[in-house]
């Protein structure tokens, strides 16, 4: 079976987002008419892959997300998974 996944990785709410704070501090230099209350920078990883079943695909995505894609000490993750046909 062939799959497409999007893994969303976000800093935990308790973790300060230095990059987001830097962007927020400078938004008005580019877009003077908006006032940003909160800005967080996140990551999205998109991948297509083959796996024997949807259950196995989810198991493997869990492992990848925990061990490779996210720093689980400071980040949370979730994903969308869909079966695709070529």
Regions found by a protein language model. Name each.
Residues 2-46, 50-86:
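Long, contiguous binding/interaction regions
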């Amino acid at each position: 079976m062939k799959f497409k996944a999007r893994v969303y990785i976000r800093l935990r709410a308790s973790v300060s987002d230095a990059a987001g704070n830097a962007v927020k501090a400078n938004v008005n230099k580019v877009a003077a008419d908006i006032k940003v209350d909160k800005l967080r920078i996140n990551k999205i990883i998109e991948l297509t892959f083959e796996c024997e079943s949807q259950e196995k695909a989810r198991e493997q995505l869990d492992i990848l997300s925990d061990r490779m894609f996210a720093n689980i000490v400071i980040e949370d993750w979730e994903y969308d998974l869909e079966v695709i046909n070529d």
